[in-house]
Amino acid sequence: MGQFLNNKEPYDKYKTVMNGTFFVDKTEILKELIPALQQEQRFFCITRPRRFGKTVMANMIAAFFEKNSEKSLFEKLAIAQYDQYKEQAGCHDVIYIDFSEMPRECHSYEEYIGRIQDGLVRDINEAYPEIAIDKNEAVWDVLSQVFDKTGHKFIFVMDEWDAVFQMSFVTERDRENYLLFLKLLLKGKSYVELAYMTGVLPIAKYSDGSELNMFLEYNMATRVRFSEYFGFTESEVDSLYQCYLEQTKKPQITRENLREWYDGYHTASGERLYNPRSVVCALTDNQLSNYWVSSGKYDSIFTYISHNVDEIQNDLTLMFAGEKIPTWIQEYAATAPELKTKEEIYSAMVVYGLLTYDNGKVFIPNKELLGSYAAMMKKEQSLGYIYRLANISSQMLQATLAKDTETMTKIIQYAHNTEVPILSYNNETELSAIVNLVYLSARDQYRVEREEKAGKGFVDFIFYPVRYDQDCIILELKVDHSPEDAIAQIKEKDYALRFRGKTAEKNKYTGRILAVGISYNKETKEHDCKVEEI
């Protein structure tokens, strides 16, 4: 076992994943890779947002192919039914490189790439002691020497190939040298049996030349092949949820909860995808929560929005209210320092999984990410009216619970008087976008649903308290109608049934049920609010 050659870490890491309660078998991807061995089209680059299982797949592929692996690890998985399973499992020299790893006290590209170069040469020297290897030779020359004398080939599995481009010490010249390193290591080399590479951004973003044009690239937005192997599909989440019900004493999560919180992504063919890490975390914890953990500035929503706040401000307000924004997405998104136009910014956010794209429109994928957007809105002052409204939202909630309609009206009127650009109030969609902002803090204590089926119709907003002894809120909006009309609709349509439960059942919620009506008169440009306990 070496540092890179036939390293046992991928095997051990994949075994750990397999031992988990909520494991999904994705080994059928091997059926698509095995036929490519030693063929001309044997170079694959898979790009996906973070947390979509790229590293798990890379570990699995390395664990399957590398010599000395225990074949028993895969005997109960889908790949074991493949006719070439026994012929291919555990029979190959595998070079596994995680490009996100660095040596201790790394301050330069030379130190970074030197670790990889020296480690590979050392591994090969130990694996082939019968060959006189000059440790000062380039690794591609050493590998060529091994192939010439033994005929042995190597499978390359490379994870996070683009991590180097985000390292602070890497210069533009270093980036060029890195691409040259990969070219000299892989391109046109007979010793390459297969090359499988993963990253967030595609090769074409960084290389407009021919350095790595031997790779076939597969992204989530435009390429169908391999799409089912990254992220969880509907049927896979169905199976995981059934397992959850069988093994959890007091399940707190519904199947619809998983869809609302962690769905929202799509393959190029339109199939729905779930964030795999978040689904597993939620089922393991038996709790819906925001498991989106930022791993750096490129996962930060504001990193992108800050490049053009003025153009994106209104779209952000609408997207937070659940609207979809028409736009054109570039297949190869610009890296953060280059972002200027709205299209470039949205393209980058789609690539990093912060927005999703479907049928020519971008939108916030799910409730998990909605929480990240909400936190940003309350933090970033440069967002202007969004920040101001978000930070008076706690007052709006307290006024609502106290039935203080005078304060409620003042806050809504303040939103109007600050000349929020989106407030043309031509329809209830735009009014609801602002209501989302002025009730932003309510999301800390409530699960806020918009346009949800309740009773005999659809309610504009319904606030489910996290604690069952808290007050419940039903909110209806009206343009050119009175707030009394809104409350009358809440009563007439029996929206309160959402909180009262079925006949003969004990009510889950024990607090008050408050009906809230908010209206806007286009002629007088005035708002009115009413709160009534029902």
Each model region followed by its residue ranges:
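Structural motif
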Residues: 155, 471-473, 514
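Metal-dependent nuclease catalytic cores in nucleic-acid-processing enzymes
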Residues: 184-188, 347-355, 436-441, 489-513
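Phosphate-binding site recognition
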Residues: 1-427, 442-444
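Conserved catalytic cores of phosphodiester-cleaving nucleases, focusing on short active-site segments
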Residues: 435, 459-463, 471-479, 493
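Domain-level recognition of nuclease-like catalytic cores that cleave nucleotide substrates
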Residues: 502, 508-534
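Mg2+/Mn2+-dependent nuclease catalytic core
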Residues: 175-180, 479-497
